[in-house]
Amino acid sequence: MSSIEERVKKIVVEQLGVEEDQVTADASFIDDLGADSLDTVELVMALEEEFDCEIPDEEAEKISTLAQATSYVEANLD
């Protein structure tokens, strides 16, 4: 697991209040981890803060798993 993926996973665990072993690469934040729309907004905000980046709304809507969040951050880090 990359350090970026570990950091993203830590944020998901903290924001959604789930156990670390529940957060797999393809677990859906909403369907598998019980997040609602507010949770996903707060999750994106936490990712933006952690990685000092801005995630446009149209991109944020596409992020629904750990793998997608990690891929987005890796592709958009300076």
Swiss-Prot record:
It comes from the Bacteria. Pathway: Lipid metabolism; fatty acid biosynthesis. GO terms for cellular component: cytosol; membrane. 4'-phosphopantetheine is transferred from CoA to a specific serine of apo-ACP by AcpS. This modification is essential for activity because fatty acids are bound in thioester linkage to the sulfhydryl of the prosthetic group. GO terms for biological process: lipid A biosynthetic process. GO terms for molecular function: acyl binding; acyl carrier activity. It holds the Pfam family PP-binding. Signal peptide: none annotated. Keywords: Cytoplasm, Fatty acid biosynthesis, Fatty acid metabolism, Lipid biosynthesis, Lipid metabolism, Phosphopantetheine, Phosphoprotein. Coiled coil: none annotated. Residues 2-77 form the Carrier domain. NCBIfam families: acyl_carrier, PRK00982.1-2, PRK00982.1-3, PRK00982.1-4, PRK00982.1-5. Carrier of the growing fatty acid chain in fatty acid biosynthesis. Belongs to the acyl carrier protein (ACP) family. This is Acyl carrier protein. The gene is acpP.
